[in-house]
Amino acid sequence: MRRPITLSILILSASLGAAQVADAQDGKRLFFEADMVRHAQEGQAGPFCVLANQFKRKEAVAWRIRVLDQAGQQMDDKKLKSVVVELSDGQKIPAKWGGHPPRGTPTDFFWSLHWIIPADYPTGSLVYKVVATDLDGRTQTWEPFKREPTQLTVIAGEPTMKQ
């Protein structure tokens, strides 16, 4: 009778210890806020910096990304080694931390990057993900909804130019 009770206590202790380790690892979980907007291209008509998910070839997609720690505090370039957008075609585009708008007095700070869609890029949905790497080299990935209508989509046509 003593043996099953002792064994049960050992198993319970081991389980609680494992739960504490898991909680400690989860304590490093990051949270993401991100969107896509049309990035300003010289000669092209706006509007720019407005939400979009459909882009024509030669237009520029801009990602605006916030990475938050477990306490909800924003993580800048002193707390993260890198933030990278990885496209399903294999391209990896690094983000930069900074104030926005980039000219003038910043009203917000976040990670951002842009990608100009090549003139010969195929049309259709393009899957992407955001990978944040902390100073210890640990990574965490965020992916947007997997519904095709909400994905980044390259559509046929030419960008509208300024008159």
Where are these regions (language model features)?
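Bacterial N-terminal signal peptides that target proteins for export
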Residues: M1-S8
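Short beta-strand elements
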Residues: R138-Q163
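Short flexible loop/turn segments that cap and initiate beta-strands
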Residues: F55, E59, L68-W97
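Beta-strand-rich domain onsets/edges
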Residues: A24-A62, R66-L68, I155-Q163
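Aromatic sugar-binding surface patches on proteins
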Residues: R103-I116, P122
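Boundary at the C-terminal end of the N-terminal hydrophobic targeting segment
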Residues: A18-A24
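Bacterial N-terminal signal peptides
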Residues: S8-G17
